[in-house]
Amino acid sequence: MIQVYINGQYWGHYNLREKINKYFIAQYEGVTDEKDIDSIDILARTGTDRFTQNGSNEDWLELADFCKKNDLNDPENLQYVTDRLDVDSLFTHAAYEIILGNVDFTNVRVYRVPGGKWKYLLFDVEACWRNLDKTPLEYYIKPVTAKIQGFRHE
């Protein structure tokens, strides 16, 4: 968070961060070929809205469909998913969201470089630590939140 003053006049506070786009991801992942940079898939979800920021969402939709239709307790099915999704990225993302107590957890970004796995990006964490009267994990495992998150809830 940065406090901005211009000519002595307060203009508010701003978040200093890089723009999440194909160039940011290319630099982070070491992608240098322009064709590969243009082929980076970046998907976004804000609340219930989903959109493709760059590239295509076809592979992601196929993966999501596979997860819905198949038993992931089957080792072959689970392997299919882990071949396409960087599970460490998912777990790290979930851990950060929970530890930071982010109540705006439905604003999500995932990306994939050509030939790579889908990875989660930590994004939009301005709503962290707003519910200091509750532990973050308490918030995430309550039934309503679990349903919103898309976790299996019975």
Regions flagged by a language model, labelled:
Residues 1-154:
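Catalytic-core segments of enzymes that bind and process phosphorylated/nucleotide-bearing substrates
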